[in-house]
């Protein structure tokens, strides 16, 4: 068949390697399953975060509420990834062939969605660690600027993955420079958090730092993966990596912050939080004597 445009232009037009690779039915089903589990988990946890906010001291309730917003936003984006995945392939014989027609699969929606979710996730940190207000605003902005630059340079670069690897790598490096800047800003918040956490809870910000590095670090791996080959396994493994990263950096991260804040609320004298944590028979008796 004669292409109306050069192969390079055609390769760029399909955007992501998902549109270049024929999948076995097992790989296609795995892709659907990974995306379905991801959006299902995000939507379900809206409820968890809204309910859990009620156990916290009022000044901390905004933190799980922000997690609920992130869950809704990411859930919608991942639902869209799922439906696009379903539309992008057609069954030919026993294989799922990308149609490269009007409905092509794209990971670019993810990057668009991060523009919203990442600044929210970062702003949760100084609020949860009770950094006082003018400093909190300053730190939120100082983290969000490199974060958005990291995402947009990565968004531009990822279109190179279908063949233009120098575009993928050059913009990948530029994006990584912003990531390093972001990591430095996050470290500043963690250091402040260690300094003002109650002594019993000081391990939480310390451990969260390593958790942050390990989970946010999965995204550049997913970005670089297409260079290992255009195969069905790479396509599926990449979606799996994105999903593990999504569930870790948004959902589990939100649970960690909420559990930290439950303890902190209790230590700061908020009785419903203390009761929620209390497991001893005496504690239960005291709680019931209070009549609630
Ligand atoms: C990109 C491009 C390649 C280089 C680097 C990247 C980093 C991406 C990160 C994304 C984090 C996203 C989160 C989303 C939650 O909703 C852009 C892939 C370093 C760290 C936490």
Task: List PLM regions with ranges.
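Hydrophobic transmembrane alpha-helical segments in integral membrane proteins
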Residues: 4-42
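First transmembrane helix
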Residues: 29-55, 68, 72, 82
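Hydrophobic alpha-helical transmembrane segments of multi-pass membrane proteins
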Residues: 41, 63-87, 213-227
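Alpha-helical transmembrane segments in multipass membrane proteins, preferentially the mid-helix core
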Residues: 44-48, 124, 153-157, 177-199, ...
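Membrane-helix boundary/juxtamembrane motif in polytopic membrane proteins
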Residues: 137-142, 167-172, 189-214, 235
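C-terminal transmembrane-bundle signature of multipass membrane proteins
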Residues: 184-188, 207-292
């Amino acid at each position: 068949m004669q292409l109306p445009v050069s192969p390079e232009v055609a390769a760029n037009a399909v955007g992501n390697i998902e549109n270049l690779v024929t999948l076995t039915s097992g790989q296609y089903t795995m892709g659907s399953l990974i995306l379905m589990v991801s959006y299902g988990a995000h939507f379900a946890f809206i409820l968890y975060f809204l309910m859990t906010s009620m156990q916290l001291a009022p000044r901390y309730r905004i933190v799980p509420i922000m997690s609920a917003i992130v869950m809704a936003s990411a859930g919608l984006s991942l639902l869209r990834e799922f439906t696009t995945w379903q539309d992008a392939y057609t069954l030919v014989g026993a294989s799922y062939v990308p149609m490269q027609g009007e409905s092509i699969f794209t990971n670019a929606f993810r990057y668009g969605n991060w523009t919203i979710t990442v600044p929210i996730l970062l702003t949760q940190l100084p609020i949860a660690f009770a950094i006082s207000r003018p400093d909190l605003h300053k730190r939120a902005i100082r983290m969000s600027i490199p974060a958005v630059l990291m995402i947009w340079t990565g968004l531009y670069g990822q279109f190179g993955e279908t063949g233009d690897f120098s575009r993928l790598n050059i913009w990948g490096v530029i994006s990584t420079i912003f990531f390093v800047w972001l990591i430095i800003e996050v470290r500043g918040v963690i250091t402040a958090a260690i300094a003002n956490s109650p002594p019993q809870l000081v391990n939480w910000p310390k451990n969260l730092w390593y958790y942050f590095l390990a989970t946010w670090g999965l995204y550049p791996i997913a970005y670089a993966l297409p260079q290992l080959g255009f195969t069905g396994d790479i396509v599926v493994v990449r979606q799996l990596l994105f999903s593990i990263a999504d569930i870790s950096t948004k959902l589990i991260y939100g649970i960690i912050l909420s559990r930290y804040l439950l303890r902190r609320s209790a230590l700061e004298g908020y009785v419903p939080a203390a009761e929620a944590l209390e497991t001893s028979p005496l504690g239960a008796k005291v709680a019931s004597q209070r009549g609630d």
